[in-house]
Regions:
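A subset of signal/propeptide-processing and intrinsically disordered low-complexity segments
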Residues: 2, 20-21
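Secreted/extracellular ectodomain signature
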Residues: 23-157
Length: 157
């Protein structure tokens, strides 16, 4: 019985000694699979700028897809750029719908500034609808700041 206990103890100690090595390998693999994140600013009511922003997003998604990696993209629209995400004025709404579906397994979000939306509603005198793919954020500029503070790469087409 003592022999069995001694062998079990030695096996247990040997097993425990492998844990730090496995943890180090996992940490190394995790670091090499870095999460890619990009935020794109759209603040102009210009279809050329809007299309360029969508081209940038598509190109980045395709680049990392070819490498077998995912990327998170957030297109933040505020000021006159909010027209990109309005249901009644967006010249790129079909591209937005298609890109939202195309991006998977990467992730793309379209963020609309609520400060801008409220200002437009007040000026126009009626509620404004945004595209169904849009997430409302309290402030577009604050969203840009917070994502950059978290390490997101910033692009302004």
């Amino acid at each position: 019985m003592r022999g069995w206990l001694r062998h079990a103890t030695v096996a247990f100690i040997a097993l425990i000694s492998l844990i730090p090595a496995a943890s180090a390998e996992n940490a190394k693999a995790h670091r090499s699979a870095r999460l890619h994140r990009m935020v794109i600013q759209v603040d102009q009511n210009d279809s050329t700028v809007m299309n360029l922003a969508l081209n940038n997003a598509t190109n980045v998604i395709e680049y990392y897809r070819a490498k077998g990696q995912d990327v998170n993209v957030d297109v933040v629209a505020y000021g006159p750029g909010l027209n990109m995400l309005r249901a009644d004025t967006s010249p790129v709404q079909d591209r937005i719908k298609n890109l939202k579906n195309y991006a998977f397994p990467s992730r793309i979000q379209f963020s609309a500034c609520n400060v801008t939306k409220a200002g437009m509603e007040k000026k126009e005198g009626h509620p404004i609808d945004v595209l169904s793919e849009v997430v409302m954020v309290p402030s577009g500029v604050v969203r840009l700041m917070e994502l950059q503070e978290k390490g997101w790469s910033y692009v302004r087409p």
